[in-house]
Amino acid sequence: MNFLHYNPKHISAFDAEVHHGKNAHKLINIFTLLITLSFFIAAPLGVWYAAETDFWANLYRILTSPSKLVTDYFALGGLGSTFFNAAICGLASNMIMLLSRAQAKATTFAGYMLVVAHCFYGLNFVNMWPTILGVLLFCKILKKSFRENLHIALFSTALGPFISDFAFRYTITDTFDATNPQITVLGVIFALLFGIAAGFVVPALLPGTTAMHRGFNMYKAGLAIGILGIFIYSFMYKSLGINAPEVVDIVNPEYYALKYGYRGFVNIYLIILFTMAIIMGFIYNRNSFRGYKELLKSVSYGVDFLDKFGMSVCLINFGVYGFCILAYLNTVFVLPEIFGFLPQGVGFTGPTLGVVFAALTFSADGQQPRTIFPIVLGYGLLFAVVCGICGVMDIRVPWSLSNQGYINGLAFSTGLCAFSGKYGWKVGTLAGFLSAIICTSTSEMHGGFVLYNGGFTAGLTALVLLPILDYYKVKPKFEDDTH
């Protein structure tokens, strides 16, 4: 897998060798390794930029704290230590991909992206392992291929907050002191047994929940793991009368004084990353954007971009779509400054940077700017309706699009883009609208312990919208995967 000797002349957006052969597999491995490398480079730069002191103490605090939604690792640890956590988790994922000798696919890329995405708010190098071990044992005992279930192993890390709570708080006390974390043998046993058990349940749930939403929620693991999380939370906490932890808060006045978080650093980092993706895709696509126009015509339903267009075109899509996300975030963050009646939201926090990666998860498997736009429009429509009602009732507007819950919700609601692609922009807007209504309420169902809450929300939205479309015989406008 030598980047310097990987000949872009052998790559074509419509070349079967790219689509199905080793080249696409290699390009996924190369690009994910480059993302991991970018985290390693950003870590010391982040320490310098934020004047972060006690780097190792900050990293230790990230690794040993309960991490339910939404735990901002920039606040809990620091800018550099958070990037380093993402780097070592990303490297671990790279090593699993390489050692398993799996032929990397779009789902493998998605699994990697969701791992590194949540390393900024809830997933760390400690709590990622038990469920991966569980899936590995599931494959060994049931004689299934781990290579074919690699993406499920990576998806299962969404249950990481349960692992951290069981290990560091659940068996000790109702409260948690981030400055003095404790661990017990019983807690470790709980965490390991839970991870192993989850490894046997998640692979069994995924096919059934996918059938429920018929593939209209790209974050299909979100619905499966969200439902599982409800049962776990209800039994382990509600039924047993054990209090769930609060979101870990720590005194960090320098960070909280930043109006827009680490806006400058994160913008520069993402601009470099997205530019690199576009250039890399352009070069490996025979110095052209050939195929990207056709990708943008896709309905985003039942189409594997990697298989149809090649990874080089998917890299171009990654970069272009990423710039669209970045433009949206920079816009909504300044809206409260322009319109004084809007409540101030957040900025480029750890969760915000994390969901940028989460929103790009399926950029090789269905997500693209054209079909995403109606989903974004749906969020804007709900906000406009709320502002209108509040104006008529003469009450304060309670939230803005820059609130963390709505930023996170929208990132995962983009997984509903198949609705706009298949049924048209109006249905896509409705899907975004419905998802926005519930996006800040669903985490209470599982106690905030499921990191893929946005995918869970999108899944519930699909479960409501699909039977309505069926009942009123709303016909898909576009049957083919391109139009």
Language-model features: locations:
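C-terminal transmembrane helix pair
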Residues: 191-209, 220, 402-476
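N-terminal signal-anchor module of multipass membrane proteins
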Residues: 2-123, 277-288, 310-315, 323-329, ...
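Membrane-interface helix-loop-helix junctions at boundaries between adjacent transmembrane segments
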Residues: 18-26, 144, 160-267, 442-457
